[in-house]
Curated annotation (Swiss-Prot):
UniProt-listed SMART domains: AAA (SM00382)
Major localization listed first in the record, in broad terms: plastid
Coiled coil ranges: none
Record organism: Aspidistra elatior (Cast-iron plant)
Annotated catalysed reactions: ATP + H2O + 4 H(+)(in) = ADP + phosphate + 5 H(+)(out)
UniProt GO BP: proton motive force-driven mitochondrial ATP synthesis
EC code(s) of this entry: 7.1.2.2
Encoding gene per record: atpB
Name of this chain's protein: ATP synthase subunit beta, chloroplastic
Family per record: Belongs to the ATPase alpha/beta chains family.
Gene Ontology MF annotations: ATP binding; ATP hydrolysis activity; proton-transporting ATP synthase activity, rotational mechanism
Function of the protein: Produces ATP from ADP in the presence of a proton gradient across the membrane. The catalytic sites are hosted primarily by the beta subunits.
Gene3D superfamilies linked to this entry: 2.40.10.170, Bovine Mitochondrial F1-atpase, Atp Synthase Beta Chain, Chain D, domain 3, P-loop containing nucleotide triphosphate hydrolases
GO cellular component, one term: mitochondrion
Length: 498
């Protein structure tokens, strides 16, 4: 389906034309509204409740129609708090689904689920808006060519490459560098692909959302002086929002991303943090709508809801949306219906390891746990595939030997195993990399490493050509030439001390 943004939001003209209903029942964030016979709104239409509460405060609540109940009643889910609403209040049917601003005007700004700016930087140009509900692109529009999405991050490109227009699950706890990795990807896609990014904070902590915004301003991803030069749009539906907002904020972010893909014909990066909270919000709403709970108390429509979001994230002949989704795994149970349903849609998984972060190896991507469907010789080429497999074998052997080393020491290993350990430690350090967005904290200039350079570097380490170099020469460098130059500097420094 082609993207057809409207040139103005869903406006309702004169009072006579307004389709008016009245609130009949309020159950938390769910409202039942009675409309005149023959004037029922459609499913997904936006309804607006305007008026004053008992204290005289202005109320403006937007809801979305979810069910037609019969007897001229509809059931709708509120997108903001329902405090102060009373039975009998007037409800206006806007006659269209929720629409949000799209295009260049959204860059550098923070929006809520309704597409309203919440960053106190003034109004946003709303001449071009688009409804948040659309069908996924038709088969004939899809780009079926399998191609690698180069990120410039060595560990990702070599061992768990991303697919252009694919979906990646990002697994990581607090403090292992998830935010920095997200910001680096936003920075690299802007520089290498000329693309933009959209960040959807679904059920985020308000503090995390604020931290991300501040760090993006500090690192230049959001340009404060010239906001139009920014490379990212942010959409937040925070933890304190009602479930309706958390359930729909992912679609708001996706709609903004689709415009950049279909109209501007760009490669777009879409971040969703956290996809589990999208499911959780749907589960809360489902019970209030009177649906029978399914396995583990989740909504019976779990697969459908997930599919309607995920199937819109794809490559078309115009451009691509590559999505990186943080996945929370409840109680570390991968068989839980929420993560299990998400896994069915993912092309790659990037696992962040607390052990690597503790060693100071950043990005702390676990090279053995991270996987990708793209790592096949037919897609990445024989040379890349062989190198990646040898790197994994070397690191796996090192992992197996670690217990022996801890008890008996390196000297008790065979000559071959000692060599494997030495190369594995070099590989582990060479998988680290200085980031552009961390430059302001570390003082080290960031490095973007092309895929060919990455493969060449690891081939040289595996071949044994660099066995004589000290392992610290490989730590936090870009390509392999920088590692050899660093080794010479270390040697020179050592000679000077003597």
């Amino acid at each position: 389906m082609r993207f057809n943004p409207t040139t103005s939001g869903p406006a309702v003209s004169t009072l006579d034309e307004k389709n008016l209903g009245r609130i009949a029942q309020i159950i938390g964030p769910v409202l039942d509204v009675v409309f005149p016979p023959g004037k029922m709104p459609n499913i997904y239409n936006a309804l607006v409740v305007k008026g004053r509460d008992t204290v005289g405060q202005q109320i403006n609540v937007t809801c979305e129609v979810q069910q037609l109940l019969g007897n001229n009643r509809v059931r709708a889910v509120a997108m903001s708090a329902t405090d102060g609403l009373t039975r009998g209040m007037e409800v206006i049917d806007t006659g269209a689904p929720l629409s949000v601003p799209v295009g260049g005007a959204t860059l550098g700004r923070i929006f809520n689920v309704l597409g309203e700016p919440v960053d106190n930087l003034g109004p946003v140009d709303t001449r071009t808006t688009s409804p948040i509900h659309r069908s996924a692109p038709a088969f004939i529009q899809l780009d079926t060519k399998l191609s690698i999405f180069e990120t410039g991050i060595k560990v990702v490109d070599l061992l768990a490459p991303y697919r252009r227009g694919g979906k990646i699950g990002l697994f990581g706890g607090a403090g292992v560098g998830k935010t920095v990795l997200i910001m680096e990807l936003i920075n690299n896609i802007a520089k290498a692909h000329g693309g933009v990014s959209v960040f959807g904070g679904v059920g985020e902590r308000t503090r995390e959302g604020n931290d991300l915004y501040m760090e993006m301003k500090e690192s230049g991803v959001i340009n404060e002086k010239n906001i139009a030069e920014s490379k990212v749009a942010l959409v937040y539906g925070q933890m304190n929002e009602p479930p309706g907002a958390r359930m729909r904020v992912g679609l708001t972010a996706l709609t903004m991303a689709e415009y950049f893909r279909d109209v501007n014909e760009q490669d777009v990066l879409l971040f969703i943090d956290n996809i589990f909270r999208f499911v959780q919000a749907g589960s809360e709403v489902s019970a209030l709508l009177g649906r029978m709970p399914s396995a583990v108390g989740y909504q019976p429509t779990l697969s459908t809801e997930m599919g309607s979001l995920q199937e819109r994230i794809t490559s078309t002949k115009e451009g691509s949306i590559t999505s990186i989704q943080a996945v929370y795994v409840p109680a570390d149970d991968l068989t839980d219906p929420a993560p299990a349903t998400t896994f069915a849609h993912l092309d790659a998984t990037t696992v962040l390891s607390r052990g690597l972060a503790a060693k100071g190896i950043y990005p702390a991507v676990d090279p053995l746990d991270s996987t990708s469907t793209m790592l096949q010789p037919g897609i990445v080429g024989e040379e890349h595939y062989e190198t990646a497999q040898k790197v994994k074998q070397t690191l796996q052997r090192y992992k197996e030997l670690q217990d022996i080393i801890a008890i008996l020491g390196l000297d008790e290993l065979s000559e071959e195993d000692r060599l494997t350990v030495a190369r594995a430690r070099k590989i582990e350090r060479f998988l680290s990399q200085p980031f552009f967005v961390a430059e302001v904290f570390t003082g080290s200039p960031g490095k973007y490493v092309g895929l060919a350079e990455t493969v060449r570097g690891f081939q040289l380490i595996l071949s044994g050509e660099l066995d004589s170099l000290p392992e610290q020469a490989f730590y936090l460098v870009g390509n392999i030439d920088e590692a050899t130059a660093k080794a010479m500097n270390l040697e020179r420094g050592g000679n000077l001390k003597k």
